Amino acid sequence: MGQNQSRDKQKAIQNQPKDTGNRADIIPDATGMGPEFCKSCWFERRSLVACNNHYLCMNCLTLLLSVSERCPICKLPLPQKLKLTSSPSAPPSPSPPPYSP
């Protein structure tokens, strides 16, 4: 009853792919792309993330990542890094506003 990991688990950790910089595409709005929906909830068409051969919305992706690292639809690893196609809409602030209690 030790605190050490089993040999199989240690090998699995060592065999995991290193961070290669691959990021999943995020589609802000898929209304003009045809029948593209989240394959988990079949409702959302915004903030879709490419997961291998299908799309997941951000809500479903967050929920699925809290349960497992594998996609229940394609059984492949879920995307954990996203590639933004457009810059954020909020301008950067040069300095934070002064603190006032």
Swiss-Prot record:
Transmembrane residue ranges: none
Membrane topology designation: Lipid-anchor
Function of the protein: Plays a crucial role in virion assembly and budding. Expressed late in the virus life cycle, it acts as an inhibitor of viral transcription and RNA synthesis by interacting with the viral polymerase L. Presumably recruits the NP encapsidated genome to cellular membranes at budding sites via direct interaction with NP. Plays critical roles in the final steps of viral release by interacting with host TSG101, a member of the vacuolar protein-sorting pathway and using other cellular host proteins involved in vesicle formation pathway.
Subunit description: Interacts with protein NP; this interaction probably directs the encapsidated genome to budding sites. Interacts (via RING domain) with polymerase L; this interaction inhibits viral transcription and replication, Z partially blocks the product exit tunnel for the releasing nascent RNA product. Interacts with the glycoprotein complex; this interaction plays a role in virion budding. Interacts with host eIF4E; this interaction results in eIF4E reduced affinity for its substrate, the 5'-m7 G cap structure.
Lipidation (N-myristoyl glycine): G2
Principal location class: virion
Subcellular location: Virion; Host cytoplasm, Host perinuclear region; Host cell membrane
The record's note on its domains: Late-budding domains (L domains) are short sequence motifs essential for viral particle budding. They recruit proteins of the host ESCRT machinery (Endosomal Sorting Complex Required for Transport) or ESCRT-associated proteins.
UniProt modification remark: Myristoylation is required for the role of RING finger protein Z in assembly and budding.
Protein name: RING finger protein Z
GO biological process, one term: viral budding from plasma membrane
Sequence ranges of Pro residues compositional bias: 89-101
Motif (PTAP/PSAP motif): 88-91
Family the entry assigns: Belongs to the arenaviridae Z protein family.
Keywords assigned: Host cell membrane, Host cytoplasm, Host membrane, Host-virus interaction, Lipoprotein, Membrane, Metal-binding, Myristate, Viral budding, Viral budding via the host ESCRT complexes, Viral release from host cell, Virion, Zinc, Zinc-finger
Biased composition (Basic and acidic residues): 1-11
Positions of the UniProt region annotated as Disordered: 1-28, 82-101
Position of sequence motif PPXY motif: 96-99
UniProt key word NAD: no
Listed InterPro entries: RING_finger_Z_arenaviridae, Z_RING-type_Znf_sf, Z_RING_Znf
Annotated zinc fingers (RING-type), start-end: 38-74
GO CC list: host cell perinuclear region of cytoplasm; host cell plasma membrane; membrane; virion component
GO MF, one example: zinc ion binding
